[in-house]
Amino acid sequence: MSWQTYVDDHLMCDIEGHEGHRLTAAAIVGHDGSVWAQSATFPQFKPEEMNGIMTDFNEPGHLAPTGLHLGGTKYMVIQGEAGAVIRGKKGSGGITIKKTGQALVFGIYEEPVTPGQCNMVVERLGDYLLEQGM
């Protein structure tokens, strides 16, 4: 299965039990910042934004004072799982990032999708990739 298929079929799909509700953007990005696959709507990010995200996974709390930036959009960092999941909020939407052995799985959402639904979609794929040694 191609990485693009994972994005299209497992991240940008309808959310279980909520037909028509889906993430607004998603991607799988290597730890080095190389894009493995992304939705057409995923923002163009700067290398320093990806460096900040990777630093926060290695040093939890790093982004809390400044916020998480992706594609020039600033998200307020909210509770996550140290070294495993970063979550951010901006207005009625937000972002979830799950770290696997080799990649970062990104999901960006807006209402009516809820933070919990975004977390479920992103973390389920991230957990699957971890189980596969990725």
UniProtKB/Swiss-Prot annotation:
InterPro entries: PFN, PFN_euk, PFN_sf, Profilin_CS. Phosphorylated by MAP kinases. Keywords: Actin-binding, Allergen, Cytoplasm, Cytoskeleton, Disulfide bond, Phosphoprotein. GO terms for cellular component: cell cortex; cytoskeleton. Disulfide bonds join 13-118. SMART domains: PROF. The modification Phosphothreonine is found at residue 114. A motif (Involved in PIP2 interaction) lies at residues 84-100. One of its GO terms (molecular function) is actin monomer binding. Its main location: cytoplasm. SUPFAM superfamilies: Profilin (actin-binding protein). It is found in: Cytoplasm, Cytoskeleton. Binds to actin and affects the structure of the cytoskeleton. At high concentrations, profilin prevents the polymerization of actin, whereas it enhances it at low concentrations. Belongs to the profilin family. Occurs in many kinds of cells as a complex with monomeric actin in a 1:1 ratio. The variability of the residues taking part of IgE-binding epitopes might be responsible of the difference in cross-reactivity among olive pollen cultivars, and between distantly related pollen species, leading to a variable range of allergy reactions among atopic patients. This is Profilin-3.
